[in-house]
Amino acid sequence: MNSFTRALFDEYLRKTGWNRGNLYTNLTQSADEVLNLEIPSGINCDLSSIPSPNFASNWEIQMLPILNGSVSYLYSNVDLRLPQNVFGHFAQHQQKFQHLLPPYRHLKTELTDMGFERKPYLMFGKLHLPTAKLEAIFAKRISPPNNLIIRMCHTKRGILTSTSTLLHWQRDTGRSCTEILYSTDEAMIGFRKLWNSGRLQPSLFESANLTKFDPFWSVGAEVYYGALTKCVGASIGARLYSCANGVHNPYSVTCTLNPIVGHLVSTFATSHNDTRVLCSQFEFNLYSYESRLRLGMELFQRKRLLTNEDNHSDDIRQQGNDGVLRLSVSTDGDLVVAWNGQLRDFLYTVGTKVHMLSINPVFFGIHFQYSH
């Protein structure tokens, strides 16, 4: 998914009341989204359209260094219209720091209380050209605490074709969240579990009105096994986080360990008044003693609000362009700088990546997006 279709998928999860932050898969998402900057490769252009509340399409073309593209379609029985506010539309695409919600119970009548007569579902398909690679996603809310996501990928190289399928079942009870995965690649099966401590919210509607500053603890683990390759993997992790309540700045502190390879990672991320985000990540290997430190930052430029005093009216007009400056640097010498901005209905990204400790070439890219 690109940024536009991903924004629609996030809107689907938000409007159906699914707490994606309560998954072990997304334990370190707040820091990863800030540090792992995606720099456009060459010159890219996206054209997106939402002709109806339930249907969206996207065309993407890459002109440099090689010519390729893709076309994708998305359909859902959920109203996926993005906010009409200009800055809200921009922030929907560019916000990277994930504001976590407190754990809450899913009531039996949650979906009907939100106005859904049928169980919410979403279908997404993407065709890459000229490789004819096909991607598909099907997501359905089986019940208030259960969610199912099926991902498929079909590729063709000459006369050889391959199809892979990933089944991802999620069950969120508020106090804990269970994930079971199965992939046809290597016949891999995985199990993830996340436990939460702290005050459990009675429902989604009460968690949205949280005013008290209460930090929450989350502890989880995962294990997976590949039957074809006889490969085993495991990891454990913990997270301490707070929620945005209008008084205190939200933060997220995580620590994960892969005991097989001895890889230890700790992260810290915080957001200040939705205008700046600071993030750090420290990696250490218990066996080789190798380490790495990464720092990330986001600075948002807001539109200035000016009152028309000449005619003594209360009309407020906005001037200037929205934008966000992203910066990521590591002790390996990697420096990544990106600027995301909006000009009328166009979103653009300009970025570069430099390795300061070597003579490798500098990467530079431009990405344009238009939606209506």
From Swiss-Prot:
It comes from the Eukaryota. It is a multi-pass membrane protein. Keywords: Membrane, Mitochondrion, Mitochondrion outer membrane, Transmembrane, Transmembrane beta strand. It is found in: Mitochondrion outer membrane. One of its GO terms (biological process) is mitochondrion-endoplasmic reticulum membrane tethering. GO terms for cellular component: ERMES complex; SAM complex. InterPro entries: Mdm10. Belongs to the MDM10 family. HAMAP family: Mdm10 (MF_03102). Component of the ERMES/MDM complex, which serves as a molecular tether to connect the endoplasmic reticulum and mitochondria. Components of this complex are involved in the control of mitochondrial shape and protein biogenesis and may function in phospholipid exchange. mdm10 is involved in the late assembly steps of the general translocase of the mitochondrial outer membrane (TOM complex). Functions in the tom40-specific route of the assembly of outer membrane beta-barrel proteins, including the association of tom40 with the receptor tom22 and small TOM proteins. PANTHER family: MITOCHONDRIAL DISTRIBUTION AND MORPHOLOGY PROTEIN 10. This is Mitochondrial distribution and morphology protein 10.
